[in-house]
Curated annotation (Swiss-Prot):
It comes from Atropa belladonna (Belladonna). The gene is rpoC1. This is DNA-directed RNA polymerase subunit beta'. In plastids the minimal PEP RNA polymerase catalytic core is composed of four subunits: alpha, beta, beta', and beta''. When a (nuclear-encoded) sigma factor is associated with the core the holoenzyme is formed, which can initiate transcription. GO terms for cellular component: chloroplast; DNA-directed RNA polymerase complex; mitochondrion. It holds the Pfam family RNA_pol_Rpb1_1. Its main location: plastid.
């Protein structure tokens, strides 16, 4: 559908019987109204043509071949001079055959049928609105017991209130035997309400605003009672309060969307367009049909049987009528959601029929596979790997993917710069991978964002915009901080990349969808760009260090000299036999890059004169004196060098290269943020 802002959208919800009839009914040029499917047949076995008023009827759903009716007559489509617009013999319109992809039909049900999604799916919408146990409603829908319908100011044959009690269940079986079908209908319409019709009557009598008011009053009363001290009673009250909240939210949703509660009970059953449930002829002349066709046939058979019982036969016991209504209800349940009530229906080969729910839900359903997961132009797909050197708003795009996605832009660039005379020459240069092609590709990519999407896209952060950069290999590089929004990890996950073409799409991507502009969760407002998985493991490895204490590697006098003054060339000496001293962090990282020390090797790093360390009353582990009078106080994680007059000359802390690298990254990030903030103010 298209709203008032001209946005295309898809809305799923309950609709009225009038709306279903409007979708499926069409008026032929001769004034005849068609749309109701009354026969369970598909194609005639001799002529291989659709049966009239059947599941593939050309009068209802349109011609199989464009402009050709069931009789074989042909008319030019769209020609105003051609008259008439339909065949007077078979009643088929001369229209495009693509109408069979969206033209619906309907089945007029002989009795109301409850929509199984609203009854059996948890939470049950019908049970919530009626405030009745689900088991009780199921017994009513499937004709296990009945409601008495007391009529005011009139004498009633049954003096009952509410439900038949279980000890007098025999009434349900004995009363219908005394009435013919017509008499039983009169009696039942006056005295007893059973089946989905009883549910529909109760839903139609509901006032949603009164439900909201009463539920809020009851919720407040339960809140005022407080805790009783009995754990079981407190849990019962808590469950009741949660139920009232769900009931209020459901009623508000119905009011907001202009949905009537009784629409959850079907009187008209929509029939899908035939192209969405096709019958295909395979090798050998055999036919392969969609399971939905067989389920529709089952519904029509049972519905026609019930119609015959209610209209033609006058001596059928009422119990048989109720049993047939139950069969119609079960057939519609199987069509909508096979197996929701227990054992699913199977065919002759013990294969479970694929119902409407199975067609649309799941990874291989209509939405995730056909609509959301369909292949589109200007898109690609590849495995994601971590790109630790990337900025948060950038992603690494393999050259092979980038040149395919931006090929048209590169061709335009080659022609504009007079490097190619036509499209063919430009494509030839791209196939040969000339250096100028990569230069133009870099220019094109600088100002063009791309969209990355990881299925399933459950919330808006499942698709975000990035500035692409060329990388080697065949995998898409991604910053690890954006993984939580995508719910992705680097164990083989795949992501799709899309190129926004229009200027509006590019502006929307830059203003709303860039990853550095989506740092908070839209659901709860908490930060979502936080270190997870690989980053946490990396931080742990970076800062774990050597777990050995200071006492394991005793103080070595050769450590007193600065590392820069060391003249030894044996790298293993620094790596395994001592803990070197460094005057600053740059020397320590330089030694690590020269592979003189390991990432987790303990070392001593000169530190600023920290007042907290100076004022500490901790007792040193060891004190070593030198010949010139200076001495070293060695503690668990730091070392103090004092002069002969006990003045502090230097302070060294015991750390690792990993800790130093993390500290420098944090310090640079804070300084960069401070500079950006000062520029902004």
């Amino acid at each position: 559908m298209i709203d008032r802002y001209k946005h295309q959208q898809l809305r799923i919800g309950s609709v009225s019987p009038q709306q279903i009839s409007a979708w499926a009914t069409k008026i032929l040029p001769n004034g005849e109204i068609v749309g109701e499917v009354t026969k369970p047949y598909t194609f005639h076995y001799k002529t291989n043509k659709p049966e009239k008023d059947g599941l593939f009827c050309e009068r209802i759903f349109g011609p199989i071949k464009s402009g050709i009716c069931a009789c074989g007559n042909y008319r030019v489509i769209g020609d105003e001079k051609e008259d008439p617009k339909f065949c007077e013999q078979c009643g088929v319109e001369f229209v495009d055959s693509r109408i069979r992809r969206y033209q619906m039909g309907y089945i007029k049900l002989a009795c109301p049928v409850t929509h199984v999604w609203y009854l059996k799916r948890l939470p049950s919408y019908i049970a919530n609105l009626l405030d009745k146990p689900l088991k009780e409603l199921e017994g009513l829908v499937y004709c296990d017991f009945s409601f008495a319908r007391p009529i005011t100011k009139k004498p009633t044959f049954l003096r009952l209130r509410g439900l038949f009690e279980y000890e007098i269940q025999s009434w349900k079986y004995s009363i219908p035997l005394f009435f013919t079908t017509q008499g039983f209908d009169t009696f039942r319409n006056r005295e007893i309400s059973t089946g989905a019709g009883a549910i529909r009557e109760q839903l139609a009598d509901l006032d949603l605003r009164i439900i909201i008011e009463n539920s809020l009053v009851e919720w407040e009363e339960l809140g005022e009672e407080g805790h009783t001290g009995n754990e079981w009673e407190d849990r019962k009250v808590g469950r009741r309060k949660d139920f009232l909240v769900r009931r209020v939210e459901l009623a508000k949703h119905f009011i907001r969307t202009n949905i009537e509660p009784e629409w959850m009970v079907l009187c008209l059953l929509p029939v899908l367009p035939p192209e969405l449930r096709p019958i295909i002829q395979i090798d050998g002349g055999k036919l392969m049909s969609s399971d939905i066709n067989e389920l529709y046939r089952r519904v029509i058979y049972r519905n026609n049987t019930l119609t015959d019982l209610l209209t033609t036969s006058r001596s059928t016991p009422g119990e048989l009528v109720m049993c047939q209504e139950k069969l119609v209800q079960e057939a519609v349940d199987t069509l909508l959601d096979n197996g929701i009530r227990g054992q699913p229906m199977r065919d002759g080969h013990n294969k479970v029929y694929k119902s409407f729910s199975d067609v649309i839900e799941g990874k291989e359903g209509r939405f995730r596979e056909t609509l959301l997961g369909k292949r589109v132009d200007y898109s690609g797909r590849s495995v994601i790997v971590v790109g630790p050197s990337l900025s948060l708003h950038r992603c690494g795009l393999p050259r092979e993917i980038a040149i395919e996605l931006f090929q048209t832009f590169v061709i335009r660039g080659l022609i504009r710069q007079h490097l190619a005379s036509n499209i063919g020459v430009a494509k030839s240069k791209i196939r040969e991978k000339e250096p100028i092609v990569w230069e133009i590709l870099q220019e094109v990519m600088q100002g063009h964002p791309v969209l990355l999407n990881r299925a399933p896209t459950l919330h808006r952060l499942g698709i975000q915009a990035f500035q692409p950069v060329l990388v080697e290999g065949r995998a898409i590089c991604l910053h690890p901080l954006v993984c939580k929004g995508f719910n992705a990890d680097f164990d083989g996950d795949q992501m799709a990349v899309h190129v926004p073409l229009s200027l509006e799409a590019q502006v929307e991507a830059r203003l709303l969808m860039f990853s550095h502009m989506n740092l908070l969760s839209p659901a709860i407002g908490d930060p979502i760009s936080v270190p997870t998985q690989d980053m946490l493991i990396g931080l742990y490895v970076l800062t774990s260090g050597n777990r050995r204490g200071i006492c394991v590697n005793r103080y070595n006098p050769c450590n007193r000299r600065n590392y820069q003054n060391q003249k030894r060339s044996d790298n293993s000496y620094y790596k395994y036999t001592k803990e070197p001293f460094f005057s600053n962090s740059y020397d320590a990282i330089g030694a690590y890059r020269q592979k003189r020390i390991n990432l987790d090797s303990p070392l001593w790093l000169r530190w600023r004169l920290d007042q907290r360390v100076i004022a500490s009353r901790e007792t040193p582990i060891e004190v070593h004196y030198e010949s010139l009078g200076t001495f070293y106080e060695i503690y668990g994680h730091y070392l103090i060098v004092r002069s002969l007059k006990k003045q502090i000359l230097f302070i060294y802390i015991r750390t690792t290269v990993g800790h130093i690298a993390l500290y420098r990254e944090i310090e640079e990030a804070i300084q960069g943020f401070s500079r950006a903030y000062s520029y902004g103010t």
